[in-house]
Amino acid sequence: MRVALILLPFVVVLLGAAEKPSVIVVTGAPGTEEYGQDFAKWADQWKAASKKAKATFRQVGKAKKGDPKDDLRKILAKESKKSPQPLWVVLLGHGTYAGKQAKFNLNGPDLEAGELAEWLKDFERPLVIVNCASSSSPFLNALRAKGRVVITATRSGVERNYCRLGGFLATAIGDSTADLDKDGQTSLLEAWLIAARRTAAFYEEEGRLATEHSLLDDNGDGKGTQSDWFRGLQVTKKSAEEGLLPDGLRAHQFHLIPSANERKLTAEQRAERDALELELARHRSRKTKLKDEEYYERLEEILREMSRIYFPDNQGNSNIE
C-alpha cells in the first residue's frame, strides 16, 4: 500500500506528460551558412511557441553528426498513435523533385515523401504536417488522410527556389495579432493565411516573380487550396467532389497556443466539439437539399450537443467565459 502511494504521484506525472501535444521540428541541410541561420531561427520560434503551449518539443537535424532521418523515424515510432492530443511535424529546409520523387534534404540520407507517409500511416491522432521546403508540393498527396492538415510551401514540384514561407509561419504561429476571428487564439489556418500573404507581399515589394505558392489540404483530397482562394477564413471556391467539405475548416480547429477558455476543455471535449463543428458545416452545405423543418430540426440538435460541452450541467454554469 505504501509503495502504491509513493508511486502514485509519478504515475500522475507520466500520464499528464502523455497528454501533452507534441511538436517535432526537422531542420534540413542548409547548403549555406545564411540559410542555416534562417532555419535555426525559425526552429527557435517554434520552440518558443511550443513552450507557451506547454507542448513537448523536439528538434531533429540540429546536430551536425548522426543520421537525422533515422532519428525522426525513431521519434515517430515512440509517439502515441491514438492520443487525443495533436502531433505537429514541421520540416524547415530545402527540397528536391526529380521525376515523381520529392525529397526533403537532410545532412545524410534525404527524407522521401513516401517514407514519411509510411511512418505516419498508423497515426489516428490529430496530425499536422508542414513542409516549408522548396519542391514540397508532392508531399501533399503522399501524406493526405482524413482528419489531417498538410501544408506545403509550393504548389508544384518544379518550384525549386529557396522558400520563405517557413519564416513567416514560424512568426505567425505564436503571434496573437494573427488571430483573425478575434477568439483569443491563433489557429493554424489563421497563421498560414497570414504567412502566405506575407510571402506573396515579399515578392511583390521586391519586384520579384513569386517562386512559391503555398497549399493547404485538410479535407483529404490531396489537391490543396491556395491562400488567395480564401475570403477571410472561408474558401470562395467549392470542391468539385460532392459532399466534400472545403479546405480550411479542420486547420481552423488546431491551435498550438490555446486561449484560456480553450485550455479549460479536456482533449476529449475538444475532439467532440471539433467533430460537431464539422458536422454543422456539412449540414449547412445541404440546406438547399432539405426541407426547412428537417434542416432546422437537425441544426438545433447539433447546436444543443455543442452547448452541452460548454454547459455540461445544463444549468448555464460553465468555466468558459
Language-model regions, residue ranges each:
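Active-site-proximal C-terminal subdomain of hydrolase catalytic domains
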Residues: 44, 128-227
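Disordered regulatory segments flanking catalytic cores
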Residues: 9, 16-24, 36, 208-321
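Loop/turn elements at helix/coil->beta-strand transitions in domains of secreted/extracellular proteins
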Residues: 19-23, 53-56, 82-87, 123-128, ...
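Active-site-proximal beta-strand/loop segments in catalytic clefts of secreted hydrolases
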Residues: 26-30, 60-63, 90-94, 107-108, ...
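Cell-envelope and extracellular/periplasmic
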Residues: 18-34, 172-179
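Sec-dependent N-terminal signal peptides
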Residues: 3-13
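A short, glycine/acidic-enriched catalytic loop
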Residues: 94-123
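Functional beta-strand-loop-alpha-helix junction segments that form "active/interaction loops"
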Residues: 34, 45-85
